[in-house]
Amino acid sequence: MSTWANLGLQDSASPLMEQLIFFHDHALLILVMITILVGYLMFMLFFNSYINRFLLHGQLIEMIWTILPAIILLFIAMPSLRLLYLLDEINEPSITLKSIGHQWYWSYEYSDFNDIEFDSYMIPTNELSNDGFRLLDVDNRIVLPMNSQIRILVTAADVIHSWTIPALGVKVDGTPGRLNQTNFFINRPGLFYGQCSEICGANHSFMPIVIESVPVNFFIKWIASKVNS
């Protein structure tokens, strides 16, 4: 999901998203180098007046085009596998959030506190404030502390949904009857937008996600106000 005047990925707001961006750039560099090499070989082929005596059989070139791609694939596979394991790791979360997908809104529960749960609906365009984002703003934002390890549990009440925040590098399927989990670490304050990323019916495009990342002391005050209300 792109942001204003952005031709690439969103600015990362978590260490895992930074790693994903580094891997994207790493893989893209390899692809560019392969494209340049193949383009150069094809270009030179048109202007080559030499005749290859080993056109039908050449052991050296066959070894090269077998071993070289295998080495290149290793350079892509190793960082990819490392990232896959990092994304699956849960490191002593400070707080657990449960997200339930419905047609077509999200419900949230703060599992560490009693009776803190709410539904989050998209704000219709005709009710949107001047500084709001069309199809992205919600009536109830998720408030989470920055610089804290956060675990999220995702499920669904009806059909398959997908809870996604691109700036955090998080995408978790919400499957009815199952609990999927992942973790993330927000390293800066701000608003982070996402959307359901699994086609779930007529209003699939109208169930956005908004996270408000705040310092821990502001989060504690917010929790206290919710408990007392």
Curated annotation (Swiss-Prot):
<feature type="topological domain" description="Mitochondrial matrix">
    <location>
        <begin position="49"/>
        <end position="62"/>
    </location>
</feature>
<feature type="transmembrane region" description="Helical">
    <location>
        <begin position="63"/>
        <end position="82"/>
    </location>
</feature>
<feature type="transmembrane region" description="Helical">
    <location>
        <begin position="27"/>
        <end position="48"/>
    </location>
</feature>
<keyword id="KW-0460">Magnesium</keyword>
<dbReference type="InterPro" id="IPR036257">
    <property type="entry name" value="Cyt_c_oxidase_su2_TM_sf"/>
</dbReference>
<comment type="function">
    <text>Component of the cytochrome c oxidase, the last enzyme in the mitochondrial electron transport chain which drives oxidative phosphorylation. The respiratory chain contains 3 multisubunit complexes succinate dehydrogenase (complex II, CII), ubiquinol-cytochrome c oxidoreductase (cytochrome b-c1 complex, complex III, CIII) and cytochrome c oxidase (complex IV, CIV), that cooperate to transfer electrons derived from NADH and succinate to molecular oxygen, creating an electrochemical gradient over the inner membrane that drives transmembrane transport and the ATP synthase.</text>
</comment>
<dbReference type="Pfam" id="PF00116">
    <property type="entry name" value="COX2"/>
</dbReference>
<keyword id="KW-1133">Transmembrane helix</keyword>
<keyword id="KW-0813">Transport</keyword>
<dbReference type="Pfam" id="PF02790">
    <property type="entry name" value="COX2_TM"/>
</dbReference>
<dbReference type="GO" id="GO:0042773">
    <property type="term" value="P:ATP synthesis coupled electron transport"/>
</dbReference>
<dbReference type="InterPro" id="IPR002429">
    <property type="entry name" value="CcO_II-like_C"/>
</dbReference>
<dbReference type="GO" id="GO:0004129">
    <property type="term" value="F:cytochrome-c oxidase activity"/>
</dbReference>
<keyword id="KW-0496">Mitochondrion</keyword>
<dbReference type="InterPro" id="IPR045187">
    <property type="entry name" value="CcO_II"/>
</dbReference>
<dbReference type="GO" id="GO:0005743">
    <property type="term" value="C:mitochondrial inner membrane"/>
</dbReference>
<comment type="subunit">
    <text>Component of the cytochrome c oxidase (complex IV, CIV), a multisubunit enzyme composed of a catalytic core of 3 subunits and several supernumerary subunits. The complex exists as a monomer or a dimer and forms supercomplexes (SCs) in the inner mitochondrial membrane with ubiquinol-cytochrome c oxidoreductase (cytochrome b-c1 complex, complex III, CIII).</text>
</comment>
<feature type="binding site">
    <location>
        <position position="204"/>
    </location>
    <ligand>
        <name>Cu cation A2</name>
    </ligand>
</feature>
<keyword id="KW-0812">Transmembrane</keyword>
<feature type="topological domain" description="Mitochondrial intermembrane">
    <location>
        <begin position="83"/>
        <end position="229"/>
    </location>
</feature>
<dbReference type="InterPro" id="IPR001505">
    <property type="entry name" value="Copper_CuA"/>
</dbReference>
<feature type="binding site">
    <location>
        <position position="198"/>
    </location>
    <ligand>
        <name>Cu cation A2</name>
    </ligand>
</feature>
<protein>
    <recommendedName>
        <fullName>Cytochrome c oxidase subunit 2</fullName>
        <ecNumber>7.1.1.9</ecNumber>
    </recommendedName>
</protein>
<feature type="binding site">
    <location>
        <position position="198"/>
    </location>
    <ligand>
        <name>Mg(2+)</name>
    </ligand>
</feature>
<keyword id="KW-0249">Electron transport</keyword>
<feature type="binding site">
    <location>
        <position position="200"/>
    </location>
    <ligand>
        <name>Cu cation A2</name>
    </ligand>
</feature>
<feature type="binding site">
    <location>
        <position position="196"/>
    </location>
    <ligand>
        <name>Cu cation A2</name>
    </ligand>
</feature>
<feature type="binding site">
    <location>
        <position position="200"/>
    </location>
    <ligand>
        <name>Cu cation A1</name>
    </ligand>
</feature>
<dbReference type="InterPro" id="IPR011759">
    <property type="entry name" value="Cyt_c_oxidase_su2_TM_dom"/>
</dbReference>
<keyword id="KW-0999">Mitochondrion inner membrane</keyword>
<keyword id="KW-1278">Translocase</keyword>
<feature type="topological domain" description="Mitochondrial intermembrane">
    <location>
        <begin position="1"/>
        <end position="26"/>
    </location>
</feature>
<dbReference type="InterPro" id="IPR034210">
    <property type="entry name" value="CcO_II_C"/>
</dbReference>
<dbReference type="InterPro" id="IPR014222">
    <property type="entry name" value="Cyt_c_oxidase_su2"/>
</dbReference>
<feature type="binding site">
    <location>
        <position position="196"/>
    </location>
    <ligand>
        <name>Cu cation A1</name>
    </ligand>
</feature>
<comment type="similarity">
    <text>Belongs to the cytochrome c oxidase subunit 2 family.</text>
</comment>
<keyword id="KW-0472">Membrane</keyword>
<feature type="binding site">
    <location>
        <position position="207"/>
    </location>
    <ligand>
        <name>Cu cation A1</name>
    </ligand>
</feature>
<dbReference type="GO" id="GO:0005507">
    <property type="term" value="F:copper ion binding"/>
</dbReference>
<keyword id="KW-0479">Metal-binding</keyword>
<keyword id="KW-0186">Copper</keyword>
<feature type="binding site">
    <location>
        <position position="161"/>
    </location>
    <ligand>
        <name>Cu cation A1</name>
    </ligand>
</feature>
